[in-house]
Amino acid sequence: IDESKSYIEFLSKVEDEKKKSEYKILCQNEDFIKAIRFIENQLPIKRVYEFVILKYLISHDFCDEKIAFKILGKYLKKVSKDTIIHSFYYLNQDYFDSGQISRYLKLIDFDGKKIVKTKEFESLLENLKYKEIFEDSINYGIYTYEEEFGTADFAMPFLKLYTKYNMLNIAQLCNFPKIHSSFRGSGFLKYQDDFFLFINLEKEKFSKSAIYHNAFLSKDTFTYQSKPSQSQDKGDGQRLVENQKHKVKLHIFVRKFVQVDKKTQEFIYLGFANSVKYSGNRPISLELKLEIPLDNRLFEEFTKVI
């Protein structure tokens, strides 16, 4: 399905001839393809706001903060008004880069107070088959979210221990107010007093990061090397090595391999860590200690030599 970009496009390739031709006809509408690809590119969702709002909007004329607060209350113990507004801007493509804007259909318009369906999305919803496909995908997204996260409040940023994430997820989950694709490509990301450290344990031989060695020394302690530009005595380097003094939260994301069978792997969120030892500059070599130690299974997964 990843290669097909949406489930309906996948079906148009694998079903029997009669159904295949039905699906191919549905897939001839470029607006539909750009809309369903946007929705299914979000799966599995890590934040339920956008899908609950879209589900409501499919059968209503508009949605505002007050309505969103009410409908989200069915899915979350605690609803954040800031996250509602961030979700409106996200659906409005305010945080998309030019590539995303050209790839995906804009489904809503946001005037700062309420969101409404775009003419293009409204037109697609007049086709009952398209409407059914949108609703199925959105309902599936909400269902899998509830199975994974329940109604729990994970505070801000909205991160659940031992869940898998990619870098773009983090931009969304900390309400990052700029273009989200700028929030990737480096093993070190930050927003306000949250630092996000993305650690690959097994390096690809010819990658730039191959010279850095990260490893678990015990169930709660591991080595980490900073960005090559960071120093102990200033800026982010100083805040990193003395994170508790500077009230900086270090969020740890780890994956063993960058790719498995040519598929990029996500990172497992291990919660908070604190700096306990450090030396050198550009890069700084650190030992970090997790607040919650790894269980036996994860420790073995991360340290087993293959």
Predicted ranges, named:
Residues 259-306:
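Compact mixed alphabeta submodule
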Residues 17-20, 24-28, 32-54, 58, ...:
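Acidic, glycine-rich low-complexity segments with interspersed aromatic residues
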Residues 3, 9, 15-17, 22, ...:
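Glutamate identity and glutamate-enriched acidic tracts
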Residues 78, 87-196, 201-203:
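Charge-dense, extended regions
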Residues 4-6, 10-12, 21, 29, ...:
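Generic serine detector
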Residues 6, 16, 29, 64, ...:
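Serine/threonine-rich low-complexity intrinsically disordered regions
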Residues 1-110:
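Accessory helical-bundle/CTD segments and flexible terminal tails appended to RecA-like ATPase motors
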